[in-house]
């Protein structure tokens, strides 16, 4: 079976009625994306995705183990407890990638010393108590996926579990690869994969925050600063060069606003954390920096997307989910749009320049765990330059073709100079979706009828003219055509948006139309009408978390975090109803795994996905997957061995016991 399981036996989802075949390829306008074969069906090791080692979030490791790392070193041969029940939920599988050398280089591997730094890119992902490291993914053609049975390094933690991690791409080089790892008990570990003696632990005594780390990110173009978010809803700024405080930190209020507050740490000497952000209600699930590094988008369990200007700590935008929490967020390559996914089963596209929801996408049957823009098929920059040059697009579109496997029409390639944003989503329903956000959806629409606004709320008033896309599209909007757009019909004007038939508009699925007539509180009360399958709605247990530092989780000073009233927000510019914004249909929607999907990355030559079972899938872009003969013919042009030599693996496996504390290598 290929990595990702194209021919696997029936899993739990099949037993619950989900008998859809797992796909090994899918087709878009540009051609076929194909799943690269792998040498392993799953990673090797005793830990099962269904029987993890129980985490210990409330008991810090005692004695010397507490001082040496986030957990005491556990023997590699000790299996986790097994039982008939599902056991505690594992943290979501996450994948981090660092690129060494020029991704578009001539094909020669970067010169690096032997060991973990040898070769090109590096991939890290967590599964249960373990961290795995592999050689990188395809660059300019590859014939195989990652061999999950041959990690070049592995770390095992006891008493706590890795929940997230991030490489420092800015400083990555042949002599250093910096990695941050967050844990379920709240600690953060700093590692250098080449300098084995370099290791630091932050929040070791859990004095800063006792809840799990939900997300980590290095500040753009920074060698030492990083952000860590926690299930407490707090976001902390750290410097790897500074130690942590030996007592619970004290804070002074710097700034507060709608649903957030920012504090500076009181300390005469440089200490971590440097600052604390209290954002929203409930866990802060994920955050992302804009491409220019100036703005920070945060999504929380309270269902709000908040966009901050990072340096000034000002709230620049606010959006509310249609229902439930938001779990993931991503910026468009040009920084104009933000896409989110969450517990409403929808993907939502929010315009940063206009401060409004421009579209929603309905294709998933359960929560959306990951979203990402594809910068390699997005045409926004080409369209902007063509519009600026005044070059009218007179090319005719290619004739519509039909997919051989489904018989459904495949939309032609968009005209040169047109605006097309491509993004993807991965959900707990094991479905992978691709979406095209086209110019006809992005064109300005009349104001929403009967739309209320909350005075003083960011996002309620669109920015001044000049931020509208009308001036960027050049020769006016394209004719509305469903063959070129993956959006369902929506009202051309706002005059009838609040009419009696608006809630059951033709073309909108029944479930969505029904939700359009309910307030969020009404949906919450109708537990008997839940549409989620039990298996797919295991939920975001690993993302959530309760408890915390009883004295430190309370906001210091008179800065309470306000909560938006869902009943009042629905139908406003912060949260339009379903029929008030375009509803996108997925360009591609395929079942690609047996377990819920948690990872989605777009690279130059491939797409990377991963599921909670610990399987990494590499999907080669059209024309980028070579056969054995083609790979041999192109040797020396654009490819090099993706697996380390035997001596490299042996060198890693025989490292002395002086490796970073809390690990077994």
UniProtKB/Swiss-Prot annotation:
Residue spans of biased composition, Pro residues class:
52-64, 77-89
Q: In which tissues is it expressed?
A: Widely expressed in brain where it localizes to the olfactory bulb, forebrain, thalamus, hippocampus, cerebellum, cortex and hypothalamus (at protein level). Expression seems to be particularly strong in areas of high synaptic density such as the glomerular layer of the olfactory bulb, and mossy fiber terminal fields of the hippocampus (at protein level). Expressed in retina, with strongest expression in the external and internal plexiform layers (at protein level). Strongly expressed in brain and testis.
Q: At which residues is Omega-N-methylarginine found?
A: 543
Stated role: Regulator of the deubiquitinating USP12/DMWD/WDR48 complex. Functions as a cofactor that promotes USP12 enzymatic activity.
- The annotated regions of Low complexity compositional bias extend over 65-76, 450-491, 653-665
Q: Name one Pfam family in it.
A: WD40
Q: What PANTHER family does this protein's entry cite?
A: DYSTROPHIA MYOTONICA WD REPEAT-CONTAINING PROTEIN, WD REPEAT PROTEIN
Composition bias type Polar residues, residue spans: 634-646
Q: Which UniProt keywords apply?
A: Acetylation, Cell projection, Cytoplasm, Methylation, Nucleus, Phosphoprotein, Repeat, WD repeat
- Name the InterPro entries for this protein: WD40/YVTN_repeat-like_dom_sf (IPR015943), WD40_repeat_dom_sf (IPR036322), WD40_rpt (IPR001680), WD_repeat_creC_regulators (IPR051362)
Q: Where is this region: Disordered?
A: 1-91, 100-119, 380-413, 446-506, 524-564, 628-665
Of the GO CC terms on this record, one is: perikaryon
- GO MF term (any one): deubiquitinase activator activity
Assembly mode:
Component of the USP12/DMWD/WDR48 deubiquitinating complex. Interacts with USP12; promotes its enzymatic activity. Interacts with USP46.
Q: Where is the composition biased (Gly residues)?
A: 1-11
Residues annotated as carrying N-acetylalanine in the record are: 2
Is Oxidoreductase included in the keywords of this UniProt record?
Answer: no
Q: Where are the WD repeats?
A: 208-248, 279-318, 321-360, 363-445, 592-629
- Origin species, per record, is Mus musculus (Mouse)
Name this protein carries in UniProt = Dystrophia myotonica WD repeat-containing protein
């Amino acid at each position: 079976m290929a990595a990702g399981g194209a021919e696997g036996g029936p899993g739990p989802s099949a037993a619950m009625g989900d008998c859809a075949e797992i796909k090994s390829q899918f087709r878009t306008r540009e051609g076929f994306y194909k799943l690269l074969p792998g040498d392993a069906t799953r990673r090797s090791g005793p830990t099962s995705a269904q029987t993890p080692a129980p985490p210990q979030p409330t008991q810090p490791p005692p004695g010397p183990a507490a001082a040496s790392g986030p957990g005491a070193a556990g023997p590699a041969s000790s299996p986790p407890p097994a039982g008939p029940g599902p056991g505690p939920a594992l943290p979501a599988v996450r994948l981090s990638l660092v690129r060494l050398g020029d991704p578009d280089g001539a094909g020669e591997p970067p010169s690096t010393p032997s060991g973990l730094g040898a070769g090109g890119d590096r991939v890290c992902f967590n599964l249960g108590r373990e961290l795995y490291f592999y050689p990188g993914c395809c660059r300019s053609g590859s014939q195989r996926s990652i061999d999950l049975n041959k990690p070049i390094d592995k770390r095992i933690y006891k008493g706590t579990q890795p929940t997230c991690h991030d490489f420092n791409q800015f400083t990555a080089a042949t002599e250093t690869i910096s990695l941050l790892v967050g844990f379920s008990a709240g600690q953060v570990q700093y590692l250098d994969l080449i300098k084995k003696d370099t290791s630091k632990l932050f929040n070791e005594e859990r004095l800063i925050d006792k809840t799990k780390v939900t997300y980590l990110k290095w500040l753009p173009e920074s060698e030492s600063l990083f952000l860590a978010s926690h299930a407490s809803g707090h976001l902390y700024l750290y410097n790897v060069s500074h130690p942590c405080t030996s007592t619970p930190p004290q804070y002074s209020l710097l700034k507060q606003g709608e649903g957030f507050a920012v504090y500076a740490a009181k300390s005469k000497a440089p200490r971590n954390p440097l600052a604390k952000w209290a954002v929203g209600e409930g866990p802060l699930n994920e955050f992302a920096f804009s491409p220019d590094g100036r703005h920070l988008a945060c999504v929380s369990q309270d269902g709000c997307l908040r966009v901050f200007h990072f340096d000034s700590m000002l709230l620049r935008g606010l959006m509310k989910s249609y229902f439930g929490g938001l779990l993931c967020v991503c910026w468009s390559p040009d920084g104009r749009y933000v896409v989110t996914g969450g517990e409403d089963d929808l993907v939502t596209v929010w315009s940063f320049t206009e401060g409004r929801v421009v579209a929603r996408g309905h294709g998933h049957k359960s929560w959306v765990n990951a979203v990402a823009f594809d910068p390699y098929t997005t045409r926004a920059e080409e369209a902007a330059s063509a519009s600026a040059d005044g070059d009218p697009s007179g090319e005719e579109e290619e004739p519509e073709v039909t997919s051989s496997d489904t018989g459904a029409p495949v939309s032609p390639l968009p005209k040169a100079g047109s605006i097309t944003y491509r993004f993807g989503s991965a959900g707990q329903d094991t479905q992978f979706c691709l979406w095209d956000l086209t110019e006809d959806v992005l064109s300005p629409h009349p104001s929403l009828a009967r739309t209320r606004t909350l005075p003083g709320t960011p996002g309620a008033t669109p920015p001044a003219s000049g931020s509208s896309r009308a001036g960027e599209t050049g020769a006016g909007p394209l004719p509305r055509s469903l063959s070129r757009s993956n959006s369902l019909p929506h009202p051309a004007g706002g005059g009838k948006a609040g009419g009696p038939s608006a809630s059951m508009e033709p073309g909108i699925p029944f479930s969505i139309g029904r939700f359009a007539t309910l307030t969020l509180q009404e949906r919450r009360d109708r537990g008997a009408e839940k549409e989620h399958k039990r298996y797919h709605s295991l939920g975001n247990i690993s993302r959530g978390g309760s408890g915390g530092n009883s004295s430190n989780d309370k906001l210091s000073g008179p800065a309470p975090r306000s909560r938006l009233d869902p009943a009042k927000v629905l139908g406003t510019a912060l949260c339009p109803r379903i029929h008030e914004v375009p509803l996108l249909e997925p360009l591609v929607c395929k079942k690609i795994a047996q377990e819920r999907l948690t990872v989605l990355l777009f690279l130059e030559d491939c797409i990377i996905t991963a599921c909670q079972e610990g399987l990494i899938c590499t999907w080669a872009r059209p024309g980028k997957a070579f056969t054995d003969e083609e790979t041999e013919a192109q040797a020396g042009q654009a490819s090099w061995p993706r697996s380390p030599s035997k001596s490299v693996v042996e060198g890693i496996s025989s490292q002395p016991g002086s490796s970073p504390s809390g690990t077994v290598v």
